[in-house]
């Protein structure tokens, strides 16, 4: 699966349920803020319960799909659109190569989630794919997604 980040949004990171067992070494658990929305996003795609997703805060990303995949969008209502047309939340959505996913401002909530049937190809660090920005580990290069990431 391939996605190109056209706009990173305010704070878009890769997250799962986080890493436990390393707090005594100074690492926070990290992980998703809204566990229910995270689990529903993965359930809709028949993914493993702890499969990594994109979590975004207040302003969602703009993503271009460079290959076909199936996604689900959960969490707050950020008025998602695919190619300029409203997209449904809390359902599986087939994305074609070249499709553009955008979000408006939040109508409800502060966080949204995008799960992928073809999984996010990021390394597992200490048992988790979650981004820990302070420690610069996990997720995509240990940081939030930025414009033009691929």
Pin down the residues of each PLM region:
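Conserved "landmark" site that anchors the functional core of diverse proteins
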Residues: 1-150
